[in-house]
Structure formats: structure tokens, C-alpha cells
Amino acid sequence: MLNSPDLILSTSLIPESDFAFSDAERQALRVLAEQAAELAARPIEIEKRALWTRHNALKPTRPVIFCDPENSWNEIIPPEALACQNPIARAWEFHLRKQVFWGAEMGDDYSVLPYFPVE
């Protein structure tokens, strides 16, 4: 029952889309991806990834700080701030905007990753 394809498809977080992104959507995603990549390449982000690796391996580290706005992301990045209209482009834009905000504003030990997870 729990592995029923109908259940899996009906509860999927992946929005339906034809992947027909407009030129403006592609450009908006490219700009955000470039910003996220620049943040991820900073030496501090590399240090944070090493810190988390040591911490998760149960090696002595300083306490790590992780600030996740969780349900407040829609206040930090309101829907009207998103440029993309295509559902998948919009989800990717939201993800990238979160990464840029986290890397530029948050000041915690979360590390902006140098890759884009497509799930």
C-alpha cells in the first residue's frame, strides 16, 4: 500500500511542467546560479564544509551553528519576488534564492554547496 505508484505520484513534491522555460526564466536562473556558485567557491564555504565533515565524523570541533528559517522562507522570499512562472523553474529559482540568501546574509555554519541537486 505505502509503495503504491499512485500514492508516490500523488504526494510528489515535483511540480508538473513541460520544461518550456522562457528566455527570461533561463536568464534569471543563470544569474542566480552564478551568484550561488560564487558564494560556494569562497574559502569560508570550503572551511564550513570541512567543519561539518569533522563534526559529523564525531571529531572534536567547535559547536556548529545552523539557523534554518524553515516556515519563514516565504516571508524572506515572498512569492511575488520570484521572476519565473514555469512551476519547475519557479521551484529552482526559490531554491537558488535561498542559497544566495543563506550565503550572503545568514552568517551561520551552513555551507552553500557547489552543485545544484535536481531531485
What residue ranges belong to the model's regions?
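N-terminal basic, low-complexity leaders that serve as flexible interaction/assembly modules and, when applicable
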Residues: 1-119
